[in-house]
A protein has these predicted regions:
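Catalytic cores of phosphodiester-bond hydrolases, prominently lipid phosphodiesterases
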Residues: 1-283
């Protein structure tokens, strides 16, 4: 992960640190999708993060997890999963007064994807758990490949989930929104279960997610998604606030020689408006 991620983004991060925060930090979100959780594995990740801590968005570890401490925002934000094994290393073993380098997801009840938001994620954010990771099935329970038309009712469901997340001080992420041909699926090794079947179908979901304030959108078609999100942003020369808070998710297919260290990494570039980000850092 050092060579694959940190050293590759070094020029971006060092330039950002030199120029200072202009309201667009964090520039990069590193989402750790861990496929094994041996204590030694997690400890090695923590030790690596500590070496780059000046780059990382952090919060102070206090005596109570319930209180969300203000984030010290830096160019990189690191997110991880919801497991207790990860929390044990990334939060429990951090000394009081120390820094949290990585933030976990709240636990999601996946038994009924159509359940009300409070049934899916009953726990609010805390000092460690700051985001909510969702399969798209919580919006369209039949799944991407059988989703059918995008409707007013589906958009209302998506809006309900986003409002619930933000009302509980959580960033919200959905995975994975693709609209590829069969040939593209075959050539790239993408999962058919994540595929809406056409550009038109997935674009409607991308646009709705951006409009409603979804914080992270995961897609294998990151270049097209990025272009769409960029087109939805106001001209930099204007003074109008950015109404969108979606982030571009770039899925890395493999980690090469360190694949046994971290099974998959997702790098996500935020385009959130500053005011919403600041509210989240304060837990307000």
């Amino acid at each position: 992960m050092r060579e694959y991620f940190f050293e590759r983004v070094r020029p971006i991060v060092e330039k950002a640190l030199h120029e200072g925060n202009h309201g667009d930090w964090p520039l990069i979100t590193l989402n750790l999708d861990l496929k094994s959780e041996e204590p030694e594995h997690l400890a090695a990740i923590w030790q690596l993060l500590a070496q780059y801590q000046d780059w990382l968005t952090t919060a102070q570890r206090t005596g109570t997890i319930d209180r969300m401490e203000t984030l010290e925002v830096r160019p990189v934000l690191v997110l991880t999963g919801e497991s207790d094994a990860q929390k044990a290393v990334f939060y429990d073993q951090v000394a009081e007064g120390g820094k949290l380098f990585v933030f976990g997801a709240v636990r999601t009840n996946t038994h009924d994807p159509s359940a009300p938001p409070e049934g899916l994620a009953p726990n609010p954010a805390d000092n460690y758990h700051r985001w909510w990771n969702n399969s798209w099935r919580v919006v369209e329970p039949e799944g991407q490949s059988k989703a059918g038309d995008w409707t007013v009712e589906k958009e209302s469901r998506l809006s309900q989930l986003v409002r619930y997340a933000h009302g509980h001080n959580l960033w919200i992420r959905f995975y994975t929104l693709d609209g590829a041909t069969k040939q593209e699926l075959s050539c790239n090794g993408w999962f058919s279960s994540y595929n809406f079947g056409s550009r038109e179908a997935v674009r409607k979901r991308w646009e709705a997610a951006a409009k409603l304030g979804v914080d992270y959108i995961a897609s294998d078609q990151y270049e097209e998604l990025g272009a769409l999100l960029k087109s939805l942003r106001p001209n930099r020369a204007t003074t109008k606030p950015n109404p969108f808070s979606s982030r571009l998710a770039i899925r890395a297919a493999r980690l090469g020689p360190e694949a046994n260290f971290v099974s998959r990494v997702v790098m996500e570039k935020p385009i959130a408006k500053e005011s919403q980000w600041q509210r989240k850092t304060r837990g307000q």
